[in-house]
């Protein structure tokens, strides 16, 4: 199974030939097909005898790949998920061929070192202190959940008698925030946005103060969105940070989609306030054009995350 045979070498050449041709050409405008249609053409692809490398590559290149949207095509930029650059795709091949495991320093010191360098760069452009730190996780859903678990863990220490915990966000927040709330068994406080459809500190302060005054529920996190997936809206992060700080509430920024806009001087001002976040996420596989999928999760005080998740 792990021998480099003549057959494997021939397959490697075919893989490289296909990969180079795909990278050199303009991205195709492919699209989905129905399950029934695909099954009629391919039948069962998992068999007792196996298809073999050559046939498997043929199935992929001639059928499966053509039934997928090419998210790196300029006309598909609105699909958001991923548009890796040529360099990213090539180094994805290099990393895969190297059989790396970056889960701990013992097994993958070099990989972890490289990841830490990337995290440090993101910390620098976001304006957080050098003491901040983070980790890469598999997608924004996991990043948001991880940060919100830390947020709740912190506030539990000072408000042990709270009846129900609550996350405050806007109606435009990503569905992963609601998913995180379900997993954590906490409530969601959806707050009205301003005339520009941005969540701001004034509206959030009013909603939270009213909730705290009339119920035994307590908001443990305010989530600001840095680039909503529907309209690309960046919330008023500066005023949200101020509201959170005044009430000793964790401020998390979901920048999975749009926070990479910090790299563009023309729109950098929209993200003012992210430097005051207790945590944020950004997906390099989106506007940083890395391979899918990668979510950078950053904490202002990484030792708090270590306490919660270990």
Model features per residue range: what roles?
Residues 142-308:
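Conserved PLP-enzyme active-site core in the AAT-like
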Residues 105-109, 113, 137-145, 231-234:
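Short, conserved micro-motifs enriched in small and acidic residues
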Residues 1, 42, 98-106, 129-135, ...:
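Glycine- and acidic
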């Amino acid at each position: 199974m792990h021998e480099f045979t003549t057959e494997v070498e021939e397959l490697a050449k075919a893989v490289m030939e296909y990969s180079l041709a795909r990278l050199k050409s303009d991205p195709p405008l492919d699209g989905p097909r129905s399950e029934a249609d695909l099954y009629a053409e391919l039948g069962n692809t998992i068999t007792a005898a196996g298809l073999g490398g050559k046939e498997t590559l043929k199935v992929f290149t001639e059928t499966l790949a053509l039934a997928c949207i090419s998210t790196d095509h300029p006309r598909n930029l609105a699909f958001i998920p991923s548009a890796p650059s040529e360099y990213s795709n090539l180094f994805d091949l290099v990393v895969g061929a190297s059989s790396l495991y970056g889960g701990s320093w013992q097994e993958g010191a070099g990989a972890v070192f490289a990841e830490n360098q990337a995290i440090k760069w993101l910390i620098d452009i976001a304006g957080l202190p050098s003491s901040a730190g983070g980790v890469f996780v598999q997608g924004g859903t996991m990043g948001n959940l991880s940060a919100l678990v830390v947020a709740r863990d912190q506030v539990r220490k000072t408000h042990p008698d709270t009846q129900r915990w609550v996350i405050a966000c806007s109606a435009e927040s990503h569905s992963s925030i609601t998913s995180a709330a379900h997993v954590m068994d906490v409530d969601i406080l959806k707050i009205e946005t301003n005339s520009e459809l941005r969540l701001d500190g004034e509206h959030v302060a009013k909603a939270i103060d009213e909730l705290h005054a009339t119920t035994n529920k307590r908001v443990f996190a305010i989530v600001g969105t840095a680039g909503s997936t529907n309209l690309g809206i960046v919330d008023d992060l500066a005023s949200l940070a101020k509201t959170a700080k005044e009430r000793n509430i964790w401020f998390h920024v979901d920048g999975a989609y749009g926070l990479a806009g910090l790299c563009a001087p023309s729109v950098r001002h929209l993200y003012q306030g992210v430097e005051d976040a207790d945590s944020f996420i950004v997906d390099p596989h989106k506007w940083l054009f890395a391979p899918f999928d990668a979510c950078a999760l950053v904490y202002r005080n990484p030792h708090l995350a270590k306490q919660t998740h270990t």
